[in-house]
Amino acid sequence: MRIYNTLSRRKEEFKPLEEGKVKMYVCGPTVYNLIHIGNARPMIVFDTVRRYLEYKGYDVNYVSNFTDVDDKIIKKANEEGVSAEEISTRYIAECKKDMEGMNIKPATTHPLATQEIGGMIDMIQTLIDKGYAYEVNGTVYYRTRKFAEYGKLSKKNIDDLEAGHRDEAHSLKVTGEDEKEDPLDFVLWKPKKEGEPSWPSPWSDGRPGWHIECSVMSKKYLADEIDIHAGGEDLIFPHHENEIAQSEAANGVPFSKYWMHNAFLNIDNKKMSKSLGNFFTVRDISREYDLEVLRFFMLSAHYRNPVNFSHDLMESAKNGLDRILTAVDNLRHLSENAKDVIMTEDEKKIIASIDDIYKKFEDSMDDDFNTADAISAIFELVKLANSNSSSDNSKEYIDTLMKKITTLTDILGLKTDKKEEMLDEDIEALIAERQQARKDKNFARADEIRDELLAKGIVLKDTREGVRWSRA
């Protein structure tokens, strides 16, 4: 198995630090709103990486955090007149609903930044003691130039960097830039401002900088040195670069052996942004498609290639997924009435020929998790099943064919189990209850009903003429 390592900029043979075990950390979302489809890509991609590693026999300790203290969370809380904790708790719950819809397995651990403040204070103190950090007026900064290998992940030369040369969306804006020893130094701890959550520390009542959070949670729930650290390519600099500087200075060992990053997602060939009106949450997509279609769409491209999201491409993904699900459904129906006899020699030959398709699938996944080519192998298997199955076949043969397909779809996290169909009158009754909830301004219950129907494959569309529904 070969993985493209951002650190070396080449594919490397995958050899975990401990045989048979994989320690994997994936940067999770900042929970101040519903997750958008850009957030969904790393969730789906690295969940699939995890599933394939488990299929290969590895014991995967998969840690993915929730950033539950951040400027955006505080801003949202102040706008709504509630606590930051209330905002983060609400959107963690909503995020988990979306993750379930996309069939993303719960992480081994989902740590919360606010629950790990003690560990962050300890690591910051270690960095101060080692001379890698310093305190000024209650703020603690990291001495960027002291870490000789700074820039090794992003391939940025520290001498070419200028203050402010950081992703604007992720920059930690701290007043008093002139108090830094060097403009490139970044914040580890900042003093509280009015209306912000804070924690006591040796330097000031305040809160941690964003970068220190992942260094500490990775250390606590995995180890000082881990196998895979992953996230979107927008995190390479400054977030992951700063994590390396913190962790390696504090712990004295390499932070992660392999670094994996997924490419950006565009909408109709444009960057997704609220100002362009092309911003979609996962919940938005769920109103038109089963979220399994979104998962299939994301896996139809290699994770390191940019993905272009459009309605036409989602329709294409829906049709592709339907081909697979229909094949499994047909086999399921054949199995119910098939003869309970042993396989014939001809049937055994067909099953044996599937080994070649499995090899194609595994070769694709072993080559830096090429899910696009892996899906092509599944389509090849579906074609074989469609043209070599009938009511004349044995039950053992039909069941084996079906199992061969579902083993591969399970690796990609694509569910093939049949959804129980709701009766029309039950659907109409729930829609009526939803309409009443909206009249009563009980929007939480209205959303709950819509999500409940969606989970059963029923898509609602609000129109001027009333609510229309269809089966996904």
Swiss-Prot record:
Enzyme class: ligase
Gene Ontology CC terms, in alphabetical order: cytosol
Residue window of motif 'HIGH' region: 29-39
Subcellular location: Cytoplasm
GO molecular function, one term: zinc ion binding
Cofactor notes: Binds 1 zinc ion per subunit.
GO BP annotation list: cysteinyl-tRNA aminoacylation
Major localisation: cytoplasm
Catalytic activity: tRNA(Cys) + L-cysteine + ATP = L-cysteinyl-tRNA(Cys) + AMP + diphosphate
Pfam family, one: CysS_C
Amino-acid positions noted as binding ATP in the UniProt annotation, renumbered to this chain: K274
Alphabetized InterPro entries for the sequence: Cys-tRNA-ligase, Cys-tRNA-synt_Ia_DALR, Cys-tRNA/MSH_ligase, CysS_C, Rossmann-like_a/b/a_fold, tRNA-synt_1_cat_dom, tRNAsynth_Ia_anticodon-bd
Positions that bind Zn(2+): C27, C214, H239, E243
Record's keyword terms, sorted: Aminoacyl-tRNA synthetase, ATP-binding, Cytoplasm, Ligase, Metal-binding, Nucleotide-binding, Protein biosynthesis, Zinc
EC numbers on record: 6.1.1.16
Family classification: Belongs to the class-I aminoacyl-tRNA synthetase family.
Quaternary data: Monomer.
PANTHER family (alphabetical): CYSTEINE--TRNA LIGASE, CYTOPLASMIC, CYSTEINYL-TRNA SYNTHETASE
Protein name: Cysteine--tRNA ligase
